[in-house]
């Protein structure tokens, strides 16, 4: 059956739109796949098999973005300690900190709290934010200062020195208040740029999610 010019034009338009749609979907899938691969490479492991013979004591760190946590289930999963996000910067308090702290203790999980360090904020004021919101008993784990580069920030040597000074001020303020030396949590990049050689007196917690660390001598993983 012969098609009119109008029908041919309409069919050509449908074909073009269909091709464009396929290309857009394919491009979107590539972006999605790349995003998933990037996430898996840097942030997720798809689950880590724990050798309980080598590592009989296991723990987790949590924050509000984990949502509501069933702490009984956590304990039943052989997780015996937890570091819980308490504060960030000079005035932010994690909205689930008190809830997580209370319920973890109720389920016989040993707890510790951590502060997320903001590079552009005063170190002492950040320590006071943590101090004003976290009371530690003798049975609790030491305070943790989470120091990680974020947002693709670049630093000159001058600004690096300023950040290092503020990290030191934060750690010293925490140590004087709690009379316990804090733990420094960081990742490889931040360790190389800010921590290495500057905070050797502090226990170091390196973020290495999916495999045992190879670059540093470590106590446990």
Residue spans for each PLM region:
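Short, well-structured secondary-structure segments
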Residues: 80-87, 105-120, 142-144
């Amino acid at each position: 059956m012969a098609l009119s010019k109008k029908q041919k034009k309409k069919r050509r338009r449908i074909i073009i739109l269909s091709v464009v749609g396929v290309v857009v979907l394919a491009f979107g899938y590539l972006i999605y796949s790349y995003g998933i691969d990037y996430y898996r490479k840097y942030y997720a492991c798809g689950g880590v098999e724990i050798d309980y013979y080598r590592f009989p004591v296991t723990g987790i760190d949590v924050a509000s973005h984990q949502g509501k946590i069933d702490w009984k289930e956590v304990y039943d999963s052989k997780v015996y300690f937890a570091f819980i996000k308490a504060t960030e910067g000079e005035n932010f308090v994690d909205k689930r900190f008190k809830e997580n702290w209370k319920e973890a203790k109720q389920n016989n999980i040993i707890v510790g709290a951590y502060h997320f360090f903001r590079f552009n904020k005063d170190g002492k004021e950040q320590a006071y934010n943590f101090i004003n919101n976290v009371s530690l008993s003798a049975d609790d784990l030491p305070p943790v200062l989470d120091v990680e580069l974020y947002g693709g920030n670049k630093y000159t040597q001058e600004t690096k020195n300023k950040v290092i000074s503020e990290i030191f001020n934060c750690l010293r303020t925490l140590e004087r208040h709690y009379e316990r030396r804090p733990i420094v949590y960081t990742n490889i990049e931040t360790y190389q740029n800010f921590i290495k050689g500057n905070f050797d007196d502090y226990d170091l917690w390196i973020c290495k999610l999916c495999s045992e660390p190879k670059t540093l001598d470590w106590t446990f993983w």
